[in-house]
Curated annotation (Swiss-Prot):
Transmembrane domains' residue ranges: none
Highest rank taxon of the organism: Bacteria
Protein's recorded name: Autonomous glycyl radical cofactor
Domain Glycine radical intervals: 5-127
UniProt modified residues of type Glycine radical: 102
Molecular function terms, GO-annotated: formate C-acetyltransferase activity
Cellular component annotations (GO), alphabetically ordered: cytosol
Protein keywords: Organic radical
Gene, per the UniProt record: grcA
Role description: Acts as a radical domain for damaged PFL and possibly other radical proteins.
Entries under SUPFAM superfamilies matching the protein: PFL-like glycyl radical enzymes (SSF51998)
Amino acid sequence: MITGIQITKAANDDLLNSFWLLDSEKGEARCIVAKPGFAEDEVVAVSKLGEIEYREIPMEVKPEVRVEGGQHLNVNVLRRETLEDAVKHPEKYPQLTIRVSGYAVRFNSLTPEQQRDVIARTFTESL
């Protein structure tokens, strides 16, 4: 659990009235207001703060949306045979449009290598 604190008494005078976020699960403290000897946003072991007394500071925590290594899905509702036939007979499919990396493109405008790649990665045996 994260707790916001203001140090009210400490063996190290530089810590007086400084603000920190304490992570009780990790045993870490993050400096919110920089003091001499500590950089703003620095994370240290709680033991590095030494003997301290503090008062808890009410915190309003808003959910943070984080996107890390997200997924991208392009849905093309076609049969594999249709794309394979479009490779062999592009004149029969001048308007065949697919989604690639979020963009709509004409299948026939792709290079043969790109067409093979689309066919190979679009169709799977099972999900």
